[in-house]
Amino acid sequence: MHVERICVVGLGLMGGSLALALRLARRLAIPQRPFHLTIVDTNPKTRAAAGRIADFVSDDLALGVQNADLVVLATPVRTIVNVLHQLPILRPDGCLVFDLGSSKSDICRAMDHLPDSFQAIGGHPMCGKEVAGFGAATPDLFRQQTFILCPTQRTTPHLEAVAHQLVVDLGARPLVLPPALHDNMVAVVSHLPYMVAAALMRHAAQVGDERLWPVSSSGFRDTSRVAGTDPQMMLDILLTNKTAVLQQIAHYQNQLADVAALIETHDEDALLQWLTETQQAYWAYRQAKKDG
């Protein structure tokens, strides 16, 4: 299912990696098919760097989307929603719309309200780095990773096929989920881990002893890694997935309270059971990821 003219709005880590991967996939495709890539970004340095992979680069959203068959929105979540509100004015004849946002309910709700001339589906690649920007983008970022697709009221069989093929072209594995279930799941495995890492990092930084950092090793580094994630992106994620995130923070606090009570009461048997069950859950998770 081939789409010739693609416009990527936002050339950060995700949008940049998608653009690089699509350019590479199209270059290696047999037979070769026409492919035109437009990049829209507000950062002058990013636009300058994008010239090596794009056929057209602009900071003008209207100009960027005017001839696109498929528009891919790769900005922070609330910006994606704002762009979706603008699209009917900028493209009254409609087009295919896809996004890479990390929370889906607000985005898919905005997609539902697009005119009939549009076809739209939500997307979320389950991968990333703790660094942001086009300079961190790589064409293999999505390879062998789960890529969630969230159908909307504006999703047609044609668009679902296009989105599925795009995900496969990126080297990822598509998984279809409804938006609300997606948001609940990623609150557990993505948004809560960020909050845990952020709280740990803030706590350690406030200890106030410069000898702490030489003492820290791989455990602290691995646990705190995602605290380096782009704050603007995380702000949008946390505010647009507020209910699910707060629920998971509460569940996590309960876990900490439970184990704190076991330590406080010196309940060795129960504490060992808690630790053993945790270890078993971890290895079950690792096996499930290995099995794919």
What are these regions (language model features)?
Residues V83-G135:
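Rossmann-like NAD(P)(H) cofactor-binding subdomain of soluble oxidoreductases
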Residues M1-V65, L70:
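NAD(P)+-binding Rossmann beta1-loop-alpha1 motif at the extreme N-terminus of oxidoreductases
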Residues L61-R91, L96-F98:
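Rossmann-like NAD(P)-binding element
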Residues P139-R225:
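Internal alpha-helical scaffold of NAD(P)-dependent oxidoreductase catalytic cores
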Residues T75-V77, G101-S102, P125, L200:
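Short glycine-/small-residue-rich Rossmann-like dinucleotide-binding loops
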Residues R5, P34-H36, Q119, T146, ...:
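Residues at the starts of beta-strands that form the adenosine-phosphate
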Residues D209-Q279:
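Interdomain hinge/lid region at the active-site interface
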